[in-house]
Amino acid sequence: MPEVQRMTLTQFLIEERRRYPDASGGFNGLILNVAMACKEIARAVAFGALGGLHGKASTQAGEEGAVNVQGEIQQKLDVLSNTTFLRVNEWGGYLAGMASEEMEAPYQIPENYPRGKYLLVFDPLDGSSNIDVNVSVGSIFSVLRAPEGADTVTEQDFLQPGSAQVAAGYALYGPTTMLVLTVGNGVNGFTLDPNLGEFFLTHPHLRVPPDTQEFAINASNSRFWEAPVQRYIGECMAGKSGPRGKDFNMRWIASMVAEAHRILMRGGVFMYPRDTKDPAKPGRLRLLYEANPIAFLMEQAGGRASTGRQTLMSVAPGALHQRIGVIFGSRNEVERIEGYHTNQTDPDLPSPLFNERSLFRASA
């Protein structure tokens, strides 16, 4: 068979830059640095237990079970991935600052490195609780513009709506390593050639089908969901005999990168909605470095991303680590769920398909 000539990530970025004659090229350098960080993390993940990086991270006192700003137990690979993102991206002169799920405050670019005009926010290793069971994990990132003239960055500088993103993407560390990227002109997927150490364009112009018969949600939280979500899931579970007149499949991986990737590949809808399980955390996912980057990708691929009440990318952030309810995927399904939120007559009335203790009604 003749060898297929594929475009590299570098070539792709050069082609994109040519669409903007006044561009400096610094943006390309930033994306390539992010890609390099993802390559390093992919290598560490691939070694698994052989690399000695499985298990919980240690505290400064040497005790197992370090906790991040989110109150979550850190894995060793969480810490390594965060350090890798900082080290690879701080020196290039493209960034004014960074923010991470693993750090309470913004990261200042060291004085011995030049400052740039962009901000980078990231979740260095999404789904890290799955590491020890060898389920796909990933890194999520978003690029914003930095304010001009400031010597240091503040939390306020990062509090920009998703609509202000310059680029966003994720790396998926699975059977193959993929980088899925939008620079505001559609969504493209690149696969890492482990022999050459280069990302090649393998999935150009990704599109999310508008309709689907597949949804992803953590059904164990059903008793805490709001009525519109209970109604939607109840109708899906009723299948052909219910109001939707068709059967649905349910998926749940507990790794948002893996869920988002499946939806970009074949459609579906993902829900981690607002609920009442923990009044201090009405939403589970973080707006700036989880929800917004995925929302940008979904919208650029023809899908939709929402809280149920408004589009995700229109939300004005109030804090660096703000949590929010998230619904994204096939446009028609997300719009249906939004309609249920808008048109609910009694927000406390669950669907009759649910009872007090079960996802679906017991047989009569």
From Swiss-Prot:
Belongs to the FBPase class 1 family. Keywords: Carbohydrate metabolism, Cytoplasm, Hydrolase, Magnesium, Metal-binding, Plasmid. It catalyses: beta-D-fructose 1,6-bisphosphate + H2O = beta-D-fructose 6-phosphate + phosphate. Mg(2+) 2 binds at residues 123, 126, 290. Homotetramer. It comes from the Bacteria. Disulfide bonds: none annotated. It is an enzyme of class 3 (hydrolase). Its main location: cytoplasm. Pathway: Carbohydrate biosynthesis; gluconeogenesis. GO terms for cellular component: cytosol. Binds 2 magnesium ions per subunit. GO terms for biological process: fructose 1,6-bisphosphate metabolic process; fructose 6-phosphate metabolic process; fructose metabolic process; gluconeogenesis; sucrose biosynthetic process. InterPro entries: FBPase_C_dom, FBPase_class-1, FBPase_N, FBPtase, Fructose_bisphosphatase_AS. Its EC number is 3.1.3.11. It is found in: Cytoplasm. NCBIfam families: PRK09293.1-3 (NF006779), PRK09293.1-4 (NF006780). Its cofactor is Mg(2+). GO terms for molecular function: fructose 1,6-bisphosphate 1-phosphatase activity; magnesium ion binding. The gene is fbp3. Substrate binds at residues 126-129, 218. This is Fructose-1,6-bisphosphatase class 1 3. The lineage of its organism: Bacteria, Pseudomonadati, Pseudomonadota, Betaproteobacteria, Burkholderiales. HAMAP family: FBPase_class1. Mg(2+) 1 binds at residues 101, 123, 125.
